[in-house]
Amino acid sequence: MPSLRLLAILTTLLAVVLMATQSSATRTTRRPKPQNTKKPPRGGGTGGGGGGGDQPARLGFRQTTTTMSPSSSLGTDETTEDTMTDAYSLSPTDSTTYAGDAYPTEFHTDSMALPGAGMGNYTLDYSHCYLNVCECCPPEKGPVGPPGERGPPGPGAERAPAVPSETLALMLGTDIYTHTFKIPILLSFYLIGDKGDQGDTGMPGAPGILGKEGQKGDLGPKGEKGETGLPGLKGDLGERGKPGWNGTQGEKGDLGKIGPAGPSGLTGPMGQNGQKGEMGECPTGEKGEKGEAGLPGPPGPRGSVGPPGVNGSNGLPGPVGLRGQLGSPGGKGEAGGRGPPGLRGMPGPKGEKGPKGPRGVRGPKGPQGETAEQIRSAFSVGLFPSKSFPPPGLPVKFDKVLYNEEEHWDPMLSKFNCTHPGVYVFSYHITVRNRPLRAALVINGVKKLRTRDSLYGQDIDQASNLALLRLASGDQVWLETLRDWNGVYSSSEDDSTFTGFLLYADPKA
């Protein structure tokens, strides 16, 4: 580290010597004497005296006044010294003041003046300047040069002790123009002090320009499953969907049991006689049974009247004679007496209904009959909302019992058990929603009644049916849906019910 510092000192001295040589070679005219001016008061003082006003007590002033002699072209300097001392025992210096308007004040900086000094005249102390340049011409502000490239970082050096700000201002002078090089080179090693304390936080700057949108980041890791949120509000009723296609046709069922023989049909009309067939050869058969009596033949002619017989005694009646031939009709005789009533003829056609006769006398009251036993059997069940859309092919679980006092409805099997044979009335009213419906009333596994309702979407419809059926004791009746058509629905506002009751019982044997 000492070798680097020594190398820096030698390099600086060599540069100073070269610059001084060039400056002395190029300067051929003598610097003119400046006009006589008074040194302005420092730190708000009112005179050129020492140490007055707000100036620190350790600083003094030295005022130099120059007067021109008429007998000589050269001026004679008369110096009035006011001792200027400070903590570092600096020697008194000669200073010459210039008018405040000699140069533009736009090149002055507040960092060159002591605290409290205004934008007035500034004095440059030449005793601390080893390199003299021409200050005859007023400086002109040249164009700003291009920024230079940043040099490589230096090796660094040990930091020298800091110089107090008052001493540094005194060593450099308070009237320093920014365009001159009259700064002591030997003080360059003392400009860098120790690192000071951190200053107060400055005011926040203006917000910067919005940067470009960054690239999309990588997909982050999957977070943990959050807690279940509160149930949302019920949404509005959606639009009605398009009608769906009809369900696929089910497979053909197994062959059912052979049913009982139906009643005989009516006798058909007699067909026409066929053509006479050829006479076939047939051996003589056995003698058949006696046929039925034929129809009576036509009456024969009336016989002639025989001679009158002798009046004899009553003899035995003779045999019945042969029926004589029908005689020719005789002339109209005289009306004879009324003969005896003949045999009863064939019944004639039914005559017209005669007028209603008078009401007869009321008969006596009959004896009291036996008390007939009243037979009852009925049920009525519904569907809870939780059992909506039941599985097809099975009895619908009607678990909401509305009436079942005779307990002929089995809630476990969802079937009605017939106890009293007779004629029953069955009806069902089914609410249909969201899905189509195909329901069937089943008796002992045989579908007796079917209902269809093709409905899709959020609309609600009702499917119902009613029938009279004769049941025998032990028969079972239930309601079931078919495949893909199980749109049975129930809610707090809509019900699906199944009802049955005995209309009249069969008479007991």
UniProtKB/Swiss-Prot annotation:
Localisation per UniProt entry: Secreted, Extracellular space, Extracellular matrix
Top-level taxon of the source organism: Eukaryota
Protein name per its UniProtKB record: Otolin-1
Purpose of the protein: Collagen-like protein, which provides an organic scaffold for otoliths onto the sensory epithelium of the inner ear. Acts as a scaffold for biomineralization by sequestering calcium.
Keyword RNA-binding: no
Gene source species: Oncorhynchus mykiss
Ranges for domain Collagen-like: 193-244, 285-329
Entry GO CC: collagen trimer; extracellular region
Low complexity bias: start-end ranges: 302-322
One Pfam family here: C1q
